[in-house]
């Protein structure tokens, strides 16, 4: 097949891919520059030349040993004289046909090409240093072509130069067990095809030239020298340069030059950078890893939560612009000289600027890479454009061929290879380094599509499928990136008439909220800047002036540097605290923290003199640069924690970089910083202090890992930091790495449990922290020393301990399991044994954040008390000094007997405020009648402000808080509506539900279990029955969740967005405002049962109104501002729009709403001026509920025909805050089952307008255009008591179940 595609170089044919480039080693195969040939039989630019799939082709072309050849035989034994004669004739023909490049005109070699085969290092090191191309030697080394096995006698790993090369003593090489095990991991089976033959090149770099010459000579003729007499019948070698053995001594001396050494190192680095190779350049076989396919992965929830920690717009780590005068070419960090001003580049640039189409051969000299990327990306999304065929085989002109050849000539490569790393697969796609430097992940679409287009492994139909897959995958990414980086979604009111702007704004909330650079790559870059910050000169430009400077000025500078150093310590504490909070307070889970050690700062080169730089702690300019970078890292970590990006791959890299930055600053400033007598306020701050004291963090992390909660970890931090005050450093010099004389972890025999005064009532989950201070050589203590040491190092009291044997105190904190059977699972024994003392409960709950009536709910939940204690600062030193020694029965904590506080002040952080916000829904727990339990989606939060996991991701399979509130408000919930949490800019208003006694309780709320059990016992004490509606799935139910007694009414149901026909059947546009009703789904069916139970249990109370539009108001971004409450009443709307109702209304944000053809409802919400003036801004249309059977739902909309579907398609229920839900029975075809006419909207218009314009999902429709439409009277609520017996099958039967 290869013979059918033979073409001479430089003559592009109709079957060629990118324009060809002359290549000596591929003269007879029609080289295409980077090795990209035709799909029928050419080479694949991305394939592995040593891959097993290519061995057949290699054997057919003579590039690999034939089947049955012993791999252990010598090359001379396996090659016959006839084959050698044929080889010699081929070499002679190649010598005649290949033009020899002019050495003087050749530019210096650029390390942009990384070869996978043995021809990667075709030049001698001395020739590299002298600028000689030595083409003859390169031709002689062409014997092992790409894809060939390495010589069995060649070494696969470099050896020391002094060791002589091994010589083969026998005709056959018999591998032994020792040689096999020591042969650098190379095997003779499947890994042989993955081993790299370029390991010989490393031996060239190590100086074994004699062995190289002998090995190269064996490739042509048997023996150590190519000058040996030829055997009978053997063709003499063609005339050419002298044998390699004669030319070896001359370049040997020049190989020691710095240029040759630098080139050798660069080539070794270039070979090691090839994908799939280790540090020495050998291929490494990837080991398969076990992959867990859980329910989250199969349902898509895992991929919906995927984060990588990187932010669009920030450079990829290691990527950057090329040096001046050069352009990106090759691998990461490689470049070539630019061609600006060359006639080929200028002519191609003019054609590119005038065409308006992507260039078939693109080079950086043509202009901005963003333009070419944008054109290719838009081309890929153009139907019937044959984008894949264009990427594989574009039509080129002679100017394109000239440009490609000029770029290849200037790169400095002598010949081409399909395994070179070029940064792009196709000629038309710009170098990937420009996308990496710009942080544009969407630009990867062009490279992925080009890789598919150039592949030989897919046919046309398969490539079309892959292109569709890429389009669907990249579309949301491109929407977010373009909106965030071009500002299309950041200007409210600008371009509001464009229907695409709204979609872009909804698609990019997370991207717009994060400035470029505040991601994982930004933190890595900050670490690089911090490490490279130069030291300031001692006296500026004049050393004499610095020597004779005034003493007061010097003291002032040192004082200023000291203040900046203290701020650096505070910033380091902030970094570790941000990391700890990002990993839920578990310091042991922070990557890189367990092995953190203070690092010595980089010292300036050269001998120290009178003008040497000042020490780091006195270098104020350098400290200010460090402080700036440390604060940047701290802010970036906080943003990553809020987005939920710390527990992903990029977040781990960012965490390691942040820890390294802290270690670098600690090593420079630790010896000179003054000691703070105060105890650390958190475990993270204690970790920073230990680093600055050159102490190991392992005892602290071990104590934190074994502690039951974060409060015990902080206690361990205090224990680790307390002995530090009385210790002296051995020397004021910089901190040394923990090699020989570093501190060792304390012995575990001495612990607080052995000290007098401790008893069995110690905190049960965690061992007591060590009482001996960590030191290199602990001295024997006096008899009274154990008690004093235990009193000095005793940690702050923990919040939770074991329940006392004599029984818990009624005012203590412990789980009150309701008596008798329960609807939900009972908590575990460990949860029932957790106990908090009355005094600790009183201190922890005494905060304005917790309303007084709701504090008993915290008393019912020890886990909540432990969470509060973890956020409290340590006790004051005065309180600790006043503490007595022993424990007592009532207060097992040593600090309680002296009258001091057990815990320091509570730090009410944002997450804690959000978790405690539920306590303000209903002021008095006695007024709670209905409790709705729900599990929010990641990012949903009833308190507003966004949860710590970042913005929520829309899910059609699982409902959360958004769907729950939409059902209670009798409205639809979609990703583009105000009901979706991703569009909220503030906390939704649910006060109308609270006024009815309905409490919404999340599984993430503080004291979730204690609150449910407290409300149940409170209702039982008042001889009342509580109504509990549980929408939490079994897989989301928390461990040791609340126990709901069977004395109360309990109703379990599901929360499904797919009950909305717009979500379940998006193609059925006539059913967009229809919702499927069921007694098992949170909606009208469940509400009817709850309302009936409420009327039965509380006959004197006002009736519940659960499915009403006035129950919930949202705060979203509208044309009136970023924080507008909707639905807005008509009066509020008229007051808000009044300032714009003048002659300059066209310039205001209400232009589109006041236009004659403006849609009345956008995404079922009031939008036009007429609709907003009538119902209010954002007032939603009410859906029509249809109770269909299971079979009808499974059948889909195709089989749902008849009057009911026509009614749902034409019905238009105007917004009404007090209207009940409209429910239709799906199987009722009798008379009177449907209203006489579908409800609609009548407009009082002088222009004769009668239709309502609806815009949703990119389409516009008009309903109610016929005359005579009138809004029918409201229908009464359907009697649900017996409506669901047939459908539910007794699902809610049982004691205490509605």
UniProtKB/Swiss-Prot annotation:
Physiological role: Plays an essential role in the regulation of viral gene expression by both activating and repressing host RNA polymerase II-mediated transcription. Binds with high affinity to the sequence 5'-ATCGTC-3'. Activates transcription by recruiting a form of the host TFIID to promoters and stabilizing the pre-initiation complex formation. Negatively regulates its own transcription. This immediate early (IE) protein is absolutely necessary for the transition from IE transcription to later viral gene transcription.
GO CC aspect terms: host cell cytoplasm; host cell nucleus; viral tegument
Region spans: Disordered: 1-82, 94-291, 534-554, 594-620, 718-826, 877-904
Name under which the protein is recorded: Major viral transcription factor ICP4
Family annotation (InterPro entries): Formin_Homology, Herpes_ICP4_C, Herpes_ICP4_N
Phosphoprotein recorded as keyword: yes
Domain characteristics, as noted in the entry: The N-terminal and C-terminal domains are required for the transcriptional activation function of ICP4.
Family: Belongs to the herpesviridae ICP4 family.
Gene transcribed to yield this protein: ICP4
Compartment(s) of residence: Host nucleus; Host cytoplasm; Virion tegument
Source organism of the structure: Human herpesvirus 1 (strain 17) (HHV-1)
DNA-binding region: 262-490
Subunit structure: Forms homodimers. Interacts with transcriptional regulator ICP27; this interaction is required for proper incorporation of ICP4 into virions. Interacts with host TBP and host TAF1; these interactions help the stabilization of the pre-nitiation complex on specific promoters. Interacts with host GTF2B.
GO biological process terms, semicolon-separated: DNA-templated viral transcription; positive regulation of DNA-templated transcription; response to type I interferon
Keywords tagged on the record: Activator, ADP-ribosylation, DNA-binding, Early protein, Host cytoplasm, Host nucleus, Phosphoprotein, Transcription, Transcription regulation, Virion, Virion tegument
Record bears the keyword Glycosyltransferase: no
Record-level Gene Ontology MF annotations: DNA binding
Acidic residues compositional bias, start-end: 37-47, 116-127, 199-209
Pfam families (alphabetical): Herpes_ICP4_C (PF03585), Herpes_ICP4_N (PF03584)
Compositionally skewed regions (Basic and acidic residues) per UniProt: 48-63, 130-144, 210-219, 544-554
Principal localisation: host cell
Stretches with biased composition (Pro residues): 11-23, 100-110, 234-244, 599-618, 764-783
Modification after translation: ADP-ribosylated. The long stretch of Ser is a major site of phosphorylation. Only the phosphorylated forms are capable of interacting with beta or gamma genes.
């Amino acid at each position: 097949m290869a013979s059918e595609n033979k073409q001479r170089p430089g003559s592009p044919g109709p079957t060629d891919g990118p324009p060809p480039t002359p290549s000596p080693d591929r003269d007879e195969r029609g080289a295409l520059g980077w090795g990209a040939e035709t799909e029928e039989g050419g080479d694949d630019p991305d394939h592995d030349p040593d891959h097993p799939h290519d061995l057949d082709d290699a054997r057919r072309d003579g590039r690999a040993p034939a089947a049955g050849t012993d791999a252990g035989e010598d090359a001379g034994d396996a090659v016959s004289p006839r084959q050698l004669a044929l080889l010699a004739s081929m070499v002679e023909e190649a010598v005649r046909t290949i033009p020899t490049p002019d050495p003087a005109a050749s530019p210096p070699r650029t390390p942009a090409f990384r070869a996978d085969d043995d021809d990667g290092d075709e030049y001698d090191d001395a020739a590299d240093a002298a600028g000689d191309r030595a083409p003859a030697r390169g031709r002689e080394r062409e014997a092992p072509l790409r894809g060939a096995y390495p010589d069995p006698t060649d070494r696969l790993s470099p050896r020391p130069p002094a060791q002589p090369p091994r010589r083969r003593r026998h005709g056959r090489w018999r591998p032994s067990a020792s040689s096999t095990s020591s042969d650098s991991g190379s095997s003779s089976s499947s890994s042989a095809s993955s081993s790299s033959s370029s390991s010989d090149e490393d031996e060239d770099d190590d100086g074994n030239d004699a062995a190289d010459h002998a090995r190269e000579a064996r490739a042509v003729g048997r023996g150590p020298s190519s000058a040996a007499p030829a055997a009978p019948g053997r063709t003499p070698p063609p005339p050419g340069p002298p044998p390699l053995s004669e030319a070896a001594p001359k370049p040997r001396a020049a190989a020691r030059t710095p240029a040759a050494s630098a080139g050798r190192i660069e080539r070794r680095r270039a070979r090691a950078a090839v994908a799939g190779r280790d540090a020495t350049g050998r291929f490494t076989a990837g080991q398969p890893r076990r992959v867990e396919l859980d329910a989250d992965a199969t349902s898509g929830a895992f991929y919906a939560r995927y984060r990588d920690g990187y932010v669009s717009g920030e450079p990829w780590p290691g990527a950057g612009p090329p040096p001046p005068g050069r352009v990106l070419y090759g691998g990461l960090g490689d470049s070539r000289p630019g061609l600006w001003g060359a006639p080929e580049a200028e002519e191609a640039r003019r054609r590119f600027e005038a065409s308006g189409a992507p260039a078939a051969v693109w080079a950086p000299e043509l202009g901005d890479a963003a333009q070419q990327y944008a054109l290719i990306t838009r081309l890929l999304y153009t139907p019937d454009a044959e984008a894949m065929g264009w990427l594989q085989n574009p039509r080129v002109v002679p100017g394109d061929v000239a440009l490609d050849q000029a770029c290849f000539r200037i790169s400095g490569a002598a010949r081409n290879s399909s395994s070179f790393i070029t940064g792009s697969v196709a000629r038309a796609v710009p170098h990937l380094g420009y996308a990496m430097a710009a942080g544009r992940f969407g630009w990867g679409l062009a490279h992925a599509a080009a890789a598919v287009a150039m592949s030989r492994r897919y046919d046309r139909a398969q490539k079309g499928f892959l292109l569709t897959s890429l389009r669907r995958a990249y579309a949301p990414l491109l929407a977010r990136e373009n909106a965030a980086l071009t500002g299309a979604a950041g200007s409210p009111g600008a371009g509001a008439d464009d229907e695409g702007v709204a979609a872009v704004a909804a698609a990019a909330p997370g991207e717009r909220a994060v400035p470029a650079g505040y991601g994982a790559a930004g933190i890595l870059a900050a670490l690089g800047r911090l490490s490279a910050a130069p030291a300031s000169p001692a006296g500026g430009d004049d050393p004499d002036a610095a020597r004779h400077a005034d003493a007061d000025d010097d003291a002032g500078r040192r004082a200023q540097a000291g203040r900046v150093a203290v701020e650096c310590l505070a910033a380091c504490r902030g970094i570790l605290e941000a990391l700890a909070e990002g990993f839920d307070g578990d310091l042991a889970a922070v990557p890189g923290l367990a092995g953190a050690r203070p690092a010595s700062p980089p010292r300036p080169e050269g001998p120290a003199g009178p003008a040497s730089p000042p020490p780091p702690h006195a270098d104020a300019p350098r400290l200010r640069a460090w402080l700036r970078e440390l604060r940047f890292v701290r802010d970036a970590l906080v943003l990553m924690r809020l987005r939920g990006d710390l527990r992903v791959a990029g977040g781990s890299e960012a965490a390691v970089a942040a820890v390294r930055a802290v270690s670098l600053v600690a090593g420079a400033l630790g010896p000179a910083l003054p000691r703070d007598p105060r105890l650390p306020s958190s475990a993270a701050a204690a970790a920073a202090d230990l680093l600055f004291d050159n102490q190991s963090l392992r005892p602290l992390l071990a104590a934190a890992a074994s502690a039951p909660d974060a409060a015990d970890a902080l206690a361990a931090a205090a224990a680790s930091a307390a002995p530090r005050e009385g210790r002296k450093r051995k020397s004021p010099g910089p901190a040394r790495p923990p090699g020989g004389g570093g501190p060792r972890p304390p012995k575990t025999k001495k612990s607080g449990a052995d000290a007098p005064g401790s008893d069995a009532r110690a905190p049960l989950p965690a061992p007591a922290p060590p009482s001996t201070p960590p030191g290199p050589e602990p001295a024997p203590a006096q008899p009274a020393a154990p008690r004093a040491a235990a009193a000095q190092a005793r940690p702050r009291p923990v919040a939770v301990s074991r329940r006392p044997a004599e029984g818990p105190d009624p005012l203590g904190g412990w789980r009150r399991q309701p008596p008798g059977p329960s609807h939900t699972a009972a908590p575990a024994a460990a949860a029932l044994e957790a106990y908090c003392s009355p005094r600790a409960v009183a201190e922890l709950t005494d905060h304005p954040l917790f309303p007084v009536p709701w504090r008993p709910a915290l008393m019912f939940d020890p886990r909540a008390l432990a969470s509060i204690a973890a956020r409290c600062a340590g006790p004051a030193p005065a309180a600790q000094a006043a503490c007595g020694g022993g424990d007592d029965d009532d207060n097992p904590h040593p600090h309680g007997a002296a009258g001091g506080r057990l815990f320091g002040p509570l730090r009410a952080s944002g997450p804690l405020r959000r978790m405690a916000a539920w306590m303000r829904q209903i002021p008095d727990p006695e007024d709670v009648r209905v409790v709705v339990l729900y599990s929010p989606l990641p990012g949903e939060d009833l308190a507003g402000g966004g949860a710590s996991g970042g913005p929520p991701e829309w899910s059609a399979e699982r409902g959360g808080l958004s769907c729950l509130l939409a059902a209670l408000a009798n409205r639809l919930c979609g990703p583009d509506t105000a009901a979706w949490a991703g569009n909220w800019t503030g906390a939704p208003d649910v006060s109308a539900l609270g006024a009815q006694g309905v409490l919404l309780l999340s599984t993430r709320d503080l004291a979730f279990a204690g609150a449910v059990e407290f409300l149940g016992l409170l209702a039982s004490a008042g001889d009342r029955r509580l109504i509990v509606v549980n929408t939490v799935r079994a897989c989301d139910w928390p461990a040791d969740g609340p126990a709901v007694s069977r004395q109360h009414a309990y109703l379990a149901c599901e929360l499904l967005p797919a009950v909305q026909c717009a979500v379940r059947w998006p193609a059925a546009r006539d059913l967009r405002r229809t919702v499927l009703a069921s007694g098992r789904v949170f909606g009208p069916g469940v509400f009817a049962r709850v309302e009936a139970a409420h009327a039965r249990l509380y006959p004197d109370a006002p009736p519940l109104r659960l499915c009403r539009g006035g129950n919930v108001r949202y705060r979203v971004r509208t044309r009136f501002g970023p924080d507008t409450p909707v639905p807005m009443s008509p009066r509020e709307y008229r007051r808000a729009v009044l300032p714009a109702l003048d002659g300059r209304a066209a310039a205001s944000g209400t232009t589109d709403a006041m236009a004659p053809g403006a849609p009345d409802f956008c995404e079922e919400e009031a939008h036009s001026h007429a609709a907003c003036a009538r119902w209010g801004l954002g007032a939603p249309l009410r859906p029509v509920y249809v109770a269909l059977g299971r079979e009808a739902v499974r059948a889909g909309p195709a089989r749902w025909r008849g009057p009911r579907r026509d009614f749902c398609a034409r019905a238009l229920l105007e917004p009404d805050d007090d209207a009940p839900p409209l429910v239709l029975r799906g199987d009722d075809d009798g008379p009177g089952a449907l209203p006489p006419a579908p409800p609609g909207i009548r407009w009082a218009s002088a222009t004769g307008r009668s239709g309502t314009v609806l815009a949703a999902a990119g389409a516009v429709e008009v309903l109610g255009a016929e005359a005579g439409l009138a809004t029918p009277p409201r229908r009464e609520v359907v009697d649900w008591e017996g409506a669901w017996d047939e459908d539910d099958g007794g699902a809610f039967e049982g004691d205490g179940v509605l």
